[in-house]
Design a protein with these regions (language model features):
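Short alpha-helical segments that sit at the start of domains
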Residues: 1-19
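Short acidic, hydrophobic short linear motifs in intrinsically disordered regions
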Residues: 26-38
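Interdomain "pre-motor" coupling segment immediately N-terminal to P-loop NTPase/helicase cores
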Residues: 49-120
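Dynamic helix-loop-helix/coil hinge segments at AAA+ ATPase domain boundaries and subdomain interfaces
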Residues: 113-142, 370-371
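Conserved ASCE/P-loop NTPase catalytic core
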Residues: 129-307
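A short helix-turn-beta junction within AAA+ P-loop NTPase domains corresponding to the substrate/partner-engaging
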Residues: 277, 318-334
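Conserved AAA+ ATPase small/helical "lid" subdomain
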Residues: 344-405
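C-terminal engagement/docking regions of AAA+ P-loop ATPases
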Residues: 401-416
Length: 416
């Protein structure tokens, strides 16, 4: 619910005044209604802050002003201009931080929101099967996946590349409930930390209540993936020395759903260092973040399911004591011959290529059996995609003809 009074916003009048001053410094004059909207707050909530700016001589009214939105309220329709003393004051405020955006949400409100929006959805076998129906997986693997997803427990997915580990983790994210609300930014003892990130958060277009607090964004439960580029530094708030505010660490952006450490063991930081950094958060659902620029630390809520995906044996990455902290370790095996056939047939339908037993057997006899090549779940789709592109280039219909198979496979397999 949108805060009706200044105190309901969780921010003092002086803080709101500074935020307003930064906005009007870059865009002057401004109509009162749109000035308040820049902070994503109702006009009546910021009225005391506007009055404070006028009383101190940092802004002045210029009478009624036409704005982008029509207002029938006299106060909302007033226009304001920043004064010369106001510009000097704004520069002082900007020297502290360059954050110009929606008013941040108090940290306590953020913490309460994260805890309140922990998914309570019970994942049934039927739900899991439906979510993974686009993959060909054994019933045994589905049974193994159910308990950790239900418990939102840390999970190791390991096995050869190309068998769907990342896709499995992504599909599980769809099971963890309805969209959630996250703030654009949070206020931690006067320090601003941006939380909403369009790279990781997908907005949900839905009619929201009239009195909705616009400082919050409705997003799909986030599936946040970090690959080989991940370092321990990215698991701490990043402070921009130029802008002088913080960006939330990547795993905190996954609150409410899944944080995937993809290709675990290939990062610049060692597996042990990464696990050491995350172990408290995994066990206590709290991560202690250091705000280096402010010389302070805060215990932030961490309510994400952590999935480690690796092509390596978990035992080769960390010792037994660490493995004990990640109770669920599930091997994603190569497809069986029957499963590989099913995957191939499904890929044929996707590319509208008529499946023939002769063509399929040619692939196996020519490119698998002589090399004792293991089956991988990604291969049928990759091969047929390549065959489809070759056929298009040659002006031929895509079919499981031996020459088209040869052209596709020779450019796909290193050893062919």
């Amino acid at each position: 619910m949108a805060p009706a009074r200044t105190e309901d916003s969780g921010l003092p009048v002086a803080r709101l005044a500074d935020l307003l001053l930064k906005h009007i410094y870059f865009k002057s004059p401004m109509q009162a209604k749109d000035w308040a909207a820049a902070l994503c707050l109702p006009y009546q909530t910021v009225t005391p802050a506007i009055q404070s700016l006028v009383e101190q001589g940092w802004c002045q009214t210029i009478g009624r002003m036409a704005g982008p939105t029509l207002s029938h309220d006299f106060g909302e329709s007033l226009g304001y201009l920043i004064t010369d003393p106001g510009r000097l004051r704004a520069r002082d405020v900007l020297a502290r931080d360059h954050y110009v955006g929606p008013a941040p949400v108090p940290f306590l409100q953020y913490e309460e929101s994260v805890r309140a929006q922990v998914s309570q959805a019970d994942v049934t076998a039927a739900w899991l099967t439906r979510a993974l129906q686009h993959l060909t997986l054994s019933p045994d693997l589905l049974v193994q996946l159910g308990p950790p997803v239900n418990a939102r427990a840390p999970l190791f997915l390991y096995g050869a590349p190309g068998n769907g580990k990342t896709t499995i983790a992504e599909a599980c994210a769809e099971l963890l409930g309805e969209p959630i609300y996250i703030p654009y930014a949070i206020d931690i003892e006067g320090q601003v930390m941006r939380v909403y990130d369009p790279l990781h958060h997908q907005r949900v277009q839905r009619q929201l209540p009239m009195n909705f607090d616009a400082r919050w964004v409705l997003v799909k439960r986030p599936f946040v993936k970090a690959g080989g580029e991940l370092t321990t530094a990215q698991l701490s708030p990043s402070f921009d020395p130029l802008m002088r505010y913080y960006e939330a660490p990547i795993h905190l952006k996954a609150n409410g759903c899944i944080f995937l450490l993809d290709d675990f063991g290939r990062q610049d930081s060692s597996p042990r260092a990464l696990l050491n950094r995350l172990i408290v958060a995994l066990e206590r659902r709290v991560d202690y973040l250091t705000l280096a620029g402010a010389g302070m630390a805060v215990g932030a809520p961490f309510e994400a399911m952590v999935v480690f995906s690796t092509n390596l044996e978990p035992g080769s990455l960390v010792d037994e004591a660490f493995l004990r902290r990640v109770r669920y370790k599930i091997h994603v095996p190569d497809p069986t011959p029957v499963e590989f056939l099913q995957i191939f047939q499904r890929a044929c339908k996707e590319f509208e290529i008529v499946f023939t037993e002769a063509g399929y057997n040619y692939v196996l006899d020519r490119y698998y059996k002589p090399f004792k090549r293991p089956f991988r779940g990604c291969q049928p789709r990759d091969i047929l995609n390549q065959l489809d592109e070759v056929a298009y280039f040659l002006g031929r219909p895509p079919r499981l003809d031996a020459d088209l198979i040869d052209l596709a496979c020779r450019s796909y397999f290193v050893q062919a």
